Amino acid sequence: MSQRSLEREFMDDHTPPQDVVDDVYQFLGRINRWLGGTRATLHRFEEFSRGWRAGQRVEVLDVATGGGDFARALVRWGHARGFDVRVTALDISASALRSARQRSTSDAAGLHYVCADVHRMPCREGVFDYVSCSLFFHHLTDDDVVRTLQSFDALATRGIVVNDLVRRWRHYAWSWLFTRPFNAVLRHDGPLSVRRAFRPTELAALARRAGLSWLTIRLHFGHRMTLAGERQGHRRAPSS
């Protein structure tokens, strides 16, 4: 897999029935918990939190939230450590947000759901401390990744965390195997998502193209990587 696949995933172009959408996000939630995807994102926030004050309110925008697993995990993680973490869970898909809302329970107090495009956010720039996403960038073209990183940079005053798959043959084989017992959407999109994923050097190069050389790549268990960092001398949000 020397190059990324440009084949479109089924869920990029179609909206399956709600029960299929729910099954997809339930599967992804389990994979993230069991194979370290959630831990990879929380590890980067753990590093950032060394500079936070006890009880500090921290605003996070979780882009392409899907089933909301990462948004809920961030709220729980923050509260467990004495921080007031508030997460705006953003997705362009209404069916994804329906699935996320159905799965929100005690975490709802720290969550706010918004159905919108990250490039057309109904808020001013710099309103969030951090912008995060998971399993989003492999859906995008290289040029769209650059544009999206620049949007993240405009929205976040402190930092960015991007979590995604690493393109490897071994990961492709595991994805093919794990999705066999599930629905046709997962059997198609799961392995394809690995073929569409980046290698670490490719994603780092796109960050440089976006003018965000302060973002660094880290590899994690479960064939995951994060592209993340905090801006030196955190930018202040513009006055309203």
Q: Positions of the model-derived regions?
A:
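Class I SAM-dependent methyltransferase Rossmann-like catalytic core
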Residues: 14, 18-44, 48-49
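Class I SAM-dependent methyltransferase SAM/SAH-binding core
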Residues: 59-61, 67-120
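A conserved beta-strand element that flanks and buttresses the S-adenosyl-L-methionine
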Residues: 132
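A short, conserved alpha-helix within the catalytic core of class I
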Residues: 140-151
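Conserved beta-strand signature within the Rossmann-like core of class I S-adenosyl-L-methionine
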Residues: 156-165
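C-terminal alpha-helical "lid/dimerization" subdomain adjacent to the S-adenosyl-L-methionine
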Residues: 165-210, 216-218
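Core SAM-dependent methyltransferase catalytic element
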Residues: 216-240
